[in-house]
């Protein structure tokens, strides 16, 4: 199954005090690079990064890590990124639908520092093709990444609004949960105090 990683990194990060796409971990490694690496190392054939707030600075980070020249990595800007995650998801799926022949998109968020390649591999392994709808769960709590087969892209794009992402679509088309709590917490980083030293 040919799968594209879709990294949503467009938000302003108001509670964080700035865009999460610009964050670095305690070792100076950019969250953007960490997430792109997790997707590629975990088995995605390519990665589309969706930017919005501070897009130019985020592109500079990709340049710094040499990802800007990586043919497996592309960038799309969500013009209406400030409407929430739904806008970023629509922009990313629109880009994939018009430029790729991937069977599925594995959607993740930039602010999940402990979601690594092992989680990506496990969720990808649970997919079966263009009809797949699988999401990571952490001790039973739904999270990201979420594998969305191509057959679901139109439905997700039609219902993705605000900060709910694909939730409305999932209420009518429940995804298969793929337990990953033994690999990661899946917790996001929302505030400066959430960053581990």
Where do the model's predicted regions map?
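Phosphate- and divalent-cation-binding pockets in alpha/beta enzyme and binding domains
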Residues: 57-60, 155, 188
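Conserved nucleotide-sugar donor-binding
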Residues: 141-155, 192
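Short aromatic/basic micro-patch
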Residues: 114, 147, 188
